[in-house]
Amino acid sequence: LMMTEALSRSLGADCSYAVWHATASEETLDLLERQGFVPAELPSAKPLLLVDMRSPSVLLQNIPTTLKEPFSSDRTVLAAVRAAHCRMQRALTGLYPGSLILSLNAEVIYHRLVRKIVDLNGVPAEPTVPRVLGPKMCVPFGKILRGNAIPNTVTKTIHTDRVYSPDLSESTIEAFPNYASIPCQVRTIKSFDRPVILVDDLMHPGVRIKALDPVLRQEGVDIQLVLVGILSGYGRDLMSQQKRPVDSVYFLPSLRQWFVEATLYPFIGGNTVRRSRPPVPGLLPGINHILPYAVPPFAKECGEEAVFQLSRCCLESARDVIGTLERE
């Protein structure tokens, strides 16, 4: 966590490279290598490693938040998840050798988002008795706070889903299966007659907010702030174009790629794919953007071998995590 915080703050300060020049244990060197550090080609008595921070990639570590109790707190399960995460970091360093792979913890982002929301709403972070609600309401429209209530804050989720065409050539933002249409959900938000704090996990391509913004404006919803876990320079410019105030837990000026761990693991997560017939109850048609299911969009620039190793890592990690869940 300390390494992540140091690197993320350096990115916010527009640093281009990070250098490690000090004695280090094997565990520390392994941690640095999993972040993308490579040995410098210079003579040195101490370990000398550096990493290019100009176009970092982000890995969102969210398997623990995807699992439900009692598995999400089981030590054996968490050990398997941790081992899978380390393998994933190493596989990602092969995509862009020498470039920073910043691993961010979804639980840390979640708690910091909650703190920011209650501070904005002027309420304590712990439930009060009697219950006293702040004037603003929290409206998650991504995945990070879906199904969670913020202390002393009216919370209502806009349930959205990114749905890909069968050939994966395009995608649209639609209402999550079995929920009302997006305009109906937005009208429900409007009926609360409260200033709104919109919350999402990532603002980089801004696909969800681009789809929601016209509907929110049409219904006259008072958006006080767009609050996200990770904000890129592109996302900040998009919010400036939409004239929306924005804040974040992490700000990364230049973001090359982002990877959501659960979305890469088959049978644990994935992206929804549109089908002609209704899905089986309890099951949603989905796909993971890894081999052999699909060719990742970054395959041409990263090379076949790196993409193959990443896909293999995802398949093996999903097998190990699911196998541990079955045994527990």
Question: Where does each model-flagged region fall?
Answer:
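PRPP-associated nucleotide enzymes
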Residues: 1-328
